[in-house]
Amino acid sequence: MKKTILILACGMSFLTGFSQELPKWANKAKKAVFSVITYNKDNQILNTGNGFYIDEQGTAVSDYSLFKGADHAVIVTADGKELPVKYIMGANDIYDVVKFKTEFDKKAAVLQPALQAATPGETVYLLPYSTQKSANGQNGTIAKIDTIGNNSFYYTLNMQTTDKTVSCPIMNGNGEVLGLIQKNS
């Protein structure tokens, strides 16, 4: 009996690392995260993924690989509203990032960039895309920081992620964006 309780307790503590309560600011911030659906010229789904708004004019970011070979794309907001992607503003194949313009849903939120770089060991939060109000995110810590340009950083995290979390934002404790999750190499 004691072994069963110990195994259950260990298992429950392991699971809490994957699904945890987020800070209070996260409820509003999750409204900035959306689903991206890209289509080929025959209007068949090419790829699906995530992205998030970075301003109230409809500027957003996601992973570039979603858009490769796409004819057009739409986003689906946390409220389930489908909006067209108007145009690509810039893309970087090396870092797998794309910046694009879409309509802005007035019910959505905007994620502000972090004013300072994160520090090793700092707790960070992953905000998933969800249409559910009670969707849990997860937290982890910064394991390593690499400088990749003027005030640009590449963070290695102590966090388990999946393909469903690619292009979801990573936030600091102040609710500011540090970056977006990329595919594990």
Model segments located where?
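Bacterial Sec-dependent N-terminal signal peptides
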Residues: M1-E21
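N-terminal activation segment of mature serine protease catalytic domains
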Residues: F18-Y53, T59-D63, H72, V97
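Short structured motifs
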Residues: Q20-E21, L83-V85, G140-T141
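Active-site region of chymotrypsin-like
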Residues: A29-T38, T102-A109, S134-S185
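Solvent-exposed strand-loop boundary residues in beta-sheet-rich modules
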Residues: N40-D42, D79-K81, S130, N174, ...
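Conserved hydrophobic positions within beta-strands
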Residues: G51-Y53, V85-I88, I142, I170
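Conserved active-site neighborhood of the chymotrypsin/trypsin-like protease fold
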Residues: D55-N136, N150-Y154, K164
